[in-house]
Amino acid sequence: MPLILGPIKIMNNILTIKDLCLNIRSNNHQDEKVLKNISFNIKESEIVSLIGESGSGKSLTALSIIRLLEKSCEIKSGEIIFLNKNILSLEEREMRSIRKNDISMIFQEPMRSLNPVMNIREQIKEAYQKKSSINLEQEIINNLISVGIDDAKRVINLYPHQLSGGMKQRVMIAMAIANKPKLLIADEPTTSLDVTIQKQVLDLLVEIKHKLNMSILFITHDLAVASQISDRIVVMRNGKIVENSESKKFFNSPDHSYSKSLLISSDYNKKIDHHICSSDNPILEIKNLKVYYKEKNNFFFKPDTYIKAVDDVCITLNPGMTHAIVGESGSGKSTIAKAIMGLASIKSGSISILNKNIVKMRGSSQRDFRKNYQMIFQDPFSSLNPRMRVGSIIKEGLCFLKPEINKYEIDKILSDVMIKVGLNQDSLSKYPHQFSGGQRQRIAIARVLILEPKLLICDEPTSSLDVTVQKQVLDLLVDIQTKTNIAYLFISHDIKLIANISDTMSIMNKGKIVESGKTSDIMNNANNQYTKKLLSSVPAIIK
């Protein structure tokens, strides 16, 4: 009896890019080729991950698809075919219709994409312009719940500045999928999210793909995330595509040497096993710290209510050691850093550095003591003054806290610290915008190291960096610790990454430390259910 086969469904290409070339005109009116003969396609209901370092051309490729390039960018040649139409030849009116109904994009920095003077309800309503107002409120709430915002009824009344970074990104995702587009472009959508929320968002994208038959162009530098959801991997380097293969093949046997180096960098492990012991002279000792924020009250005579951002937290950190604070957005981990730096009001408790309670310090004594503890922020570009040259940025703190040092000594110290962080002397005369993300973070590290602090607070210092650059920055921090015996307080939502460089760890949830101890003990034998949930949500490369 002959075998009768059912009809085979042929997956059509929803997007085809052919030989796309793009130039950027610099200030001296010279053209620089940034996209060089880019060609790839995306099939119906397919997830394609576009991978590469900063400056490789990933985001420019995405912006070319939706024609939102800056005026300095010019597409010199090539085609972008979407639903059998060449996007590059469409009038702007037609393009606006496509952006509204057929192609949506989630941007990496949600704060720049959300309107600061509109509440979340009004912003999501814009995505539903053509829909009836009947049950619209409930649909908005359901949409927010689907992206992991459980208290959606409260969130729709808030403004962007009242949300954490992860919450803002979830709102952006809710807006992007509101009209059920045929193609969703996601530019680093999970970079700022905690592992549990990241898993929810990835699961959601896969679910939407199947439910709506939607295609996704997923731009990321996290190979583990890409392996979780991708059907195909496209690797970019210096404006060119160096590899285009099925996900399983890519993660098992990549063809290009650059792809192989990315996979090696993603498996970061440069842990130094310190002998952990108690000390009579800890660098940092936090006892029963409480930081409460008063909630906004719109009713007369209603008693005040407080958000317990940090509730009875205790941490001890010894010289030359690294302690990690891990938790989701809103867990209170960054509030601890703010409290140490004097940027958050403390309700009760003590923070001692070098056996001195800094909570009680005021005026010049506080200023003079500040050189002993410094902080590296999550976004190096925002923390560097764009109008100052790098040399002035790095030496500013030294000149302020040590006014007795002469110019010759400052120049010598400046030269030494540049060597220490791996930057050349020519960098001193440049401005922050002339550097990559990894280089800017090195500048931020140099700015604090020049003061020779005993304690460095690192608030998500690598979360916005590519895997190779991330590895370089972490290598740098580990090497500096080995040479100087500096102590690190690392704040992160990436428990897998932080486990490779920390000696001890505290897990935070809703303002409280739910588990604390040696990193190896927590990673191998966690006791708390919340810790187990975090560990189970960590993405691993699927081969």
Regions found by a protein language model. Name each.
Residues 74-86, 349-357:
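Conserved ABC transporter NBD signature motif
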Residues 87-104, 130, 248-254, 299-304, ...:
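ABC ATPase NBD coupling module
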Residues 137-154, 408-426, 536:
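Conserved ABC ATPase "signature" region
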Residues 178-182, 450-454:
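A short, proline-enriched helix->beta-strand linker immediately N-terminal to the Walker B motif
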Residues 226-228, 498-500:
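A short, surface-exposed alpha-helical micro-motif characterized by mixed small hydrophobic
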Residues 244-245, 253, 516-517:
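ABC ATPase "signature
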